[in-house]
């Protein structure tokens, strides 16, 4: 990994590491940069965390990683950032002459990342023909570099994983690899334990929550606020709670104030468990996602997901009108008006909520750590043959 910070990919890594360790595997986590101390404390005691000397291709990093592979007797390396060629290149040289297999994972929608999306945002804001031409050229260059980097990682891995069956064709189209025999689908697990939680609808509060980073490039939390602005007066006994932080938080708080919203709370970064236990609905209005981990986290506590269908993997998780709501993706952009109409189906009908919540919990069980480990174990066994 490049980093071991507080984020979805890192949390998945720590949960899987514990599961692998609990199943009698020697597990270590290695990252290029210094790991976040809180993440290290949250990591299973049986799992060692190593760091290299910054994200770069250097003989020092190669030597340090090779020492780890040999001293820890590593058989399989899981590259949790299956895009940059630098990590793959360091690993390729470090494992030379060793019997080490490599699994690479891309944790997003192939063909989409923050750098490409930033250019698209700039492009949408300008009418200047010359600037548009420059930005289109820049976007195409980024796409070319990204696709070639992804191809490099694929070619230097024994298995390459994506998070959804719907991403297989997108991977093929984006990389130009028409017959990717090493490609497979591996979904993420629920990363929060529900403990002894039992759904009791009467204990659920009339609350919509957003959980996650607050930024514009990906999460677009302003859409949640826009939607809530159409609902607050009609449902004065409901509230919206934003759990998370990020570069756009100040702007989002100003937006809520400008709209005169009263029943909105900004909680900052918090453990989401207590919010999952009490809330009825979780909104996710991202412009793109890989998996949307918060969806299955919330679903495991009977929180009905209401999510923008901007990424194909959401349809693996949410069956619109059955275990949640999908706001249809539109080329002209997200419609707060249409989202508000769909949300009211749950907000004013307890029976609808109760049914969806039960089905959401059942869906979340497919993503339990135990179930996900079984599929990983099958992959490990295939690589060992």
Q: Where do the PLM segments sit?
A:
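N-terminal strand-loop element at the rim of the active site
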Residues: 2-7, 13, 19-57, 167, ...
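A conserved mid-protein helix/loop that constitutes part of the nucleotide-sugar donor-binding site
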Residues: 10-15, 206, 215-230, 247-253
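Short His-centered aromatic/hydrophobic patch
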Residues: 79-86, 106-109
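A short, active-site helix/loop in glycosyltransferases that binds the activated sugar's phosphate group
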Residues: 139-182, 192
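Nucleotide-activated donor-binding/catalytic signature segment of Leloir-type glycosyltransferases, i.e.
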Residues: 250-269
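Aromatic "clamp/platform" in nucleotide-sugar-dependent glycosyltransferases that forms part
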Residues: 287
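Short hydrophobic beta-strand element within catalytic cores of glycosyltransferases
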Residues: 304-308, 318
């Amino acid at each position: 990994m490049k980093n071991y910070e507080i984020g979805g990919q890192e949390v998945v890594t720590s949960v899987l590491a514990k599961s692998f360790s609990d199943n009698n595997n020697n597990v270590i986590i290695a990252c290029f940069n210094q790991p976040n101390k809180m993440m290290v404390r949250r990591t299973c005691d049986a799992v060692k965390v190593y760091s290299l000397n910054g994200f770069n291709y250097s003989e020092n990093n190669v030597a340090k990683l090779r020492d780890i592979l040999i001293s820890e007797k590593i058989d399989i390396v899981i590259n949790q950032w299956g895009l940059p060629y630098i990590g793959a290149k360091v690993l390729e040289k470090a494992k030379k002459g060793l019997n080490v297999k490599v699994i690479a994972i891309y944790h997003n929608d192939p063909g989409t990342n923050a750098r490409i999306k930033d250019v698209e945002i700039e492009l949408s804001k300008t009418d200047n023909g010359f600037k548009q031409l420059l930005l289109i050229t820049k976007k195409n260059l980024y796409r070319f570099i990204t696709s070639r980097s992804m191809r490099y990682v694929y070619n230097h891995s024994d298995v390459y994983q994506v998070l959804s069956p719907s991403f297989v064709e997108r991977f093929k189209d984006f990389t130009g690899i028409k017959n990717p025999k090493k490609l497979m689908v591996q979904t993420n697990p629920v990363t929060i334990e529900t403990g002894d939680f039992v759904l009791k609808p009467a204990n659920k509060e009339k609350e919509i929550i957003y959980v996650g980073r607050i930024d514009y490039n990906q999460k677009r939390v302003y859409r949640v606020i826009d939607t809530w602005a159409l609902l607050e007066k009609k449902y004065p006994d409901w509230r919206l709670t934003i759990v998370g932080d990020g570069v756009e938080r100040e702007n989002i708080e100003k937006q809520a104030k400008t709209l005169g919203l009263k029943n909105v709370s900004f909680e900052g970064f918090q453990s989401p468990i207590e919010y999952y236990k009490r809330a009825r609905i979780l909104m996710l209005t991202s412009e793109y996602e890989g998996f949307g981990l918060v969806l299955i986290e919330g679903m495991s506590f009977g929180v009905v997901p209401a999510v923008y269908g901007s990424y194909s993997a959401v349809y693996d998780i949410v069956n619109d009108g059955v275990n949640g709501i999908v706001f249809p993706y539109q080329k002209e952009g997200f419609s707060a008006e249409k989202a508000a109409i769909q949300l009211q189906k749950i907000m004013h009908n307890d029976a609808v909520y109760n049914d969806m919540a039960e089905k959401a919990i059942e869906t979340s069980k497919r993503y339990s750590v135990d179930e996900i480990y079984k599929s990983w174990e099958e992959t490990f066994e295939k690589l060992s043959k």
